[in-house]
Structure formats: structure tokens, C-alpha cells
Amino acid sequence: MRKIVLPGDLLSTNPRAAGYGTYVEGGKVYAKIIGLFDQTETHVRVIPLKGRYTPSVGDVVIGIIREVAANGWAVDIYSPYQAFLPVSENPEMKPNKKPNEVLDIGDAIIAKVLNIDPKMKVTLTMKDRICRPIRFGRIVAINPARVPRVIGKKGSMIKLLKSELDVQIVVGQNGLIWVNGDRRKVSIAEEAIYLIEQEAHTEGLTDRVAEFIKRRKADVGIQ
């Protein structure tokens, strides 16, 4: 899962893997900025924390369990504000189970923002069809400010990714995106998402993404 890295943190021993937010020194790749560490099969990069996510009630988010308590779970939603999932808001919690038997530290979940109190403490719920623990698939991390572009007008961009690649995608408003399906198609979806993030300010992006997917599918022999 994605973690926060600081300038100077070692990211890779392969200098050819150096991506955005990194630098190479002595044949090794280090973080140049503070941000989210993101790794693909070929590259490592650091996603800036500028534009960090500010939660709103009803938002779908993807988070990582950081602490387990008797009454619920502390969840990192990559926001300056704390998030908590009460046991009463997790349908998988049963009377004969302990919280750490349902979700443990390091587990990833899809949840919704249920409430935000005046001190910006965030309460999450998993009582929604879209919510689930993430047991498989891949999590892609982008700048939260680019989420609307990944979704597209009236969901057009996300529909394109799903229909062309036949993958499941859940976009968290906090910049974490869950992708599940055939491994090769998931990899192409991940690449396409990064393309959208990088070129979010440009025109004609939907057509370029469609062409990119078509080309990458041909490269790996997908009809």
C-alpha cells in the first residue's frame, strides 16, 4: 500500500526506475519531495501532498487501517484529518468476532464519509453497496485534485476505462483508486490513470486515452 516518504528516503536501487519527485545518486533512487510513494512494475515516483484531500459527507474514500480498538478502527484516508470506522458501521462485524479478526492493521477498505464533527474528526461507514474490504486488485494513488478528471464529465472517462478494459474501478475522492480484473488489463488501466493525471489540463484527453488503451492492448495481445 502507499506510504508517505520524506526527502532523502531510499526508494529503489534501480536508477532506471526513477520517476516524478525522485532523484538519482550513487546509482540509487531517492525521494526529492514529501509525498505518497507509488511504485509500478517499471517506475517509482512520489506524488506531492499538495492538494491533500479534505473530506465531505458522502464521499467514497479508500483508506488503510492504522489502529484497531475495541470500538472500531482508525483509518488513514490520506487527509490531514483523522478518520474512524466504528464497529457499528461495519456489516462484517459480528458478536462472536473481535475487531482485529475483521480488519487488521495494514488492511485496505472502501468506505464512505458518514459524518464530520466541528473538530473535523471524520466518521466512516461501510454500510453501502460500494463499500468493502480490499482483498485483491491494485490500489493506484493520484493527486486528489485530479480525481474529477479521472471520473470525467458525467462519468465519461471512468466508463471508458471500464468498458475498454473490462475491469472493476472504484475512485476514492481522496485520490486512491481500486482497480481489479485481469492482471494485464489492470496494468493498462493503471497506466491510463497516470496519463489522465499528468495531462488533466489538456484538451482532447478522452480521445488520447482511448487511443492509448487500444495501443497498449495490441502491445500485450489483448483483443
From Swiss-Prot:
Entries under InterPro entries matching the protein: Exosome_RNA_bind1/RRP40/RRP4, KH_dom, KH_dom_type_1, KH_dom_type_1_sf, NA-bd_OB-fold, Rrp4, RRP4_N, RRP4_S1
Keywords: Cytoplasm, Exosome, RNA-binding
Domain KH: 135-193
CDD domains membership: KH-I_Rrp4_prokar, S1_Rrp4_like
Main location class: cytoplasm
Domain S1 motif: 58-127
Cellular location(s): Cytoplasm
One example GO MF annotation: poly(A) binding
GO cellular component: cytoplasm; exosome (RNase complex)
Any Pfam family: ECR1_N_2
Record GO biological process: CUT catabolic process; exonucleolytic trimming to generate mature 3'-end of 5.8S rRNA from tricistronic rRNA transcript (SSU-rRNA, 5.8S rRNA, LSU-rRNA); poly(A)-dependent snoRNA 3'-end processing; RNA catabolic process; U4 snRNA 3'-end processing
Highest taxon above the source species: Archaea
Binding partners and assembly: Component of the archaeal exosome complex. Forms a trimer of Rrp4 and/or Csl4 subunits. The trimer associates with a hexameric ring-like arrangement composed of 3 Rrp41-Rrp42 heterodimers.
Classification via PANTHER family: EXOSOME COMPLEX COMPONENT RRP4 (PTHR21321:SF4), PNAS-3 RELATED (PTHR21321)
The family this protein is said to belong to: Belongs to the RRP4 family.
Protein task: Non-catalytic component of the exosome, which is a complex involved in RNA degradation. Increases the RNA binding and the efficiency of RNA degradation. Confers strong poly(A) specificity to the exosome.
Domain notes: Contains an N-terminal domain that mediates interactions with the hexameric ring, a central S1 domain and a C-terminal KH domain.
Name this polypeptide is given: Exosome complex component Rrp4
Species for this entry: Archaeoglobus fulgidus (strain ATCC 49558 / DSM 4304 / JCM 9628 / NBRC 100126 / VC-16)
